[in-house]
Amino acid sequence: MNLFFEKTGATNVAEFSVSEIAGALKRVVEEKFGYVRVRGEISGYRGAHASGHAYFALKDDKARLEAVIWRGIMEKLKFPPEEGMEVIAVGKLTTYPGSSKYQIVIEALEPTGVGALMTLLENRKKKFAEEGLFDEEKKKPLPYMPKIIGVVTSPTGAVIRDIIHRISDRFPLHILVWPVRVQGETSGREVAAAVKGFNVLPLEGLIPKPDLLIVARGGGSLEDLWGFNDEVVVRAVYESSLPVISAVGHETDWTLIDYVADWRAPTPTAAAEKAVPVKIDLEVYVVSLGARLRTGLARYFDFHQQKLRAIIRALPTADQLFALPRRGFDEISSRLERALCVSCDKKRLYFHTLAIRFTPRLLNTEKAQHSAKEYTARLHRAFVHIVEKQRAQLEIAFRLLKSTSYQNILERGFVLALGQNNKPIKRLAQIPEKEQINLRFFDGEISVITQESFFNRSSKSKRIKSKQDDQGTLF
């Protein structure tokens, strides 16, 4: 071994420990290069570590450079790193003595151009569309009058002030704000967590569950709005059971959350206007509905009142109802009376004839007496039969007369109005003004004085005690 060092002349070379060599290399690299700009493709990115730091590599077709982004820098990035994204990294070269590796500590990271971000955005959009996340039939309808609105946005800035102001002007209601970062590496995860958080709130909890969500942010560049293109945001909105309105950027700005949301507003102010109706317009509409209802009811009652009057005019009067039965009763009564008289006359004549034919001699005989008694009994039975038959016919006629009597009509709740000389009043026009008329009920009569005109008539009645004081109302 000594011979080897003597032959190579290495005996005079300074001796270093491994740590000294690693430290020397670290100083040389850091002093020689300082800040550098490196273009490469992100490789091996698996998201931020639990500590908040990110570890990955930058590569091209010939080499590979390890990279690290500390937590403080990650939170300030305008867009999150993506696997396969071509970027320009700005940072310092250094070495890691523990594994004899050199790496770049990135302090700024940006894509190589907007075209790269647009390509990535289109690829994501195509992927989600193929999964059906943007299908119109899967979008939920917005509630017309929500009671509570949840807003996911930055707690500071003009966006939240515009939303609160616009909702308060149109239809004041309860607003819940879930504060999040709307720009930077963690913005997408915070927005997704807020949407999921609103969905899991209990309906009757201390913090009530909203009926509608608004995810809002002001305008900005593609890099500024990149957090709303995150996959976690798109899937959180798609899985939300609450309707979501997206209001990210200006009218010309489009992010993936706009495609998956149930309604896309061009601005945060437009989102507030879509979320609630105008209270004054609702009040005017309710008043108009009330007027239409009153008009409809008036027409309905007027139509049926006219129909009822037509039916009343078509009904027959009391005289018309009783005329035919009364005539039939009179005819039957007259025929019955004549029949009884004729029958009695015939029997009387027959008895008189028999009395002449009988002699005292015949009557004194036992046979004649027996025959006379028998004949008398038969005659009596025949007469009784005739009388009973006529009585039955008379009772039938009386019941028929009673069934058609106006007194029965009065017992069913009708009233007979009588004017002067107890003549029936058939029409309203026959009622004299400020005159006395009689109203006949089934159990008595009362006298009333007419006071008002034909169209507004009220009667002040002076009751006459009837035989029964406990008569009920007719209606």
Swiss-Prot record:
Please list the reactions this protein catalyses. Exonucleolytic cleavage in either 5'- to 3'- or 3'- to 5'-direction to yield nucleoside 5'-phosphates
Its Gene Ontology cellular component terms are: cytoplasm; exodeoxyribonuclease VII complex
Q: What is its EC number?
A: 3.1.11.6
Family membership noted in the UniProt record = Belongs to the XseA family.
Annotated source species: Bartonella henselae (strain ATCC 49882 / DSM 28221 / CCUG 30454 / Houston 1) (Rochalimaea henselae)
Q: Name one GO biological process term.
A: DNA catabolic process
InterPro entries named among the record's database cross-references: Exonuc_VII_L (IPR003753), Exonuc_VII_lsu_C (IPR020579), OB-fold_nuc-bd_dom (IPR025824)
One term of GO molecular function: exodeoxyribonuclease VII activity
Q: What is this protein called?
A: Exodeoxyribonuclease 7 large subunit
Q: What does this protein do?
A: Bidirectionally degrades single-stranded DNA into large acid-insoluble oligonucleotides, which are then degraded further into small acid-soluble oligonucleotides.
Q: Which PANTHER family match?
A: EXODEOXYRIBONUCLEASE 7 LARGE SUBUNIT (PTHR30008:SF0)
Where does it localize?
Answer: Cytoplasm
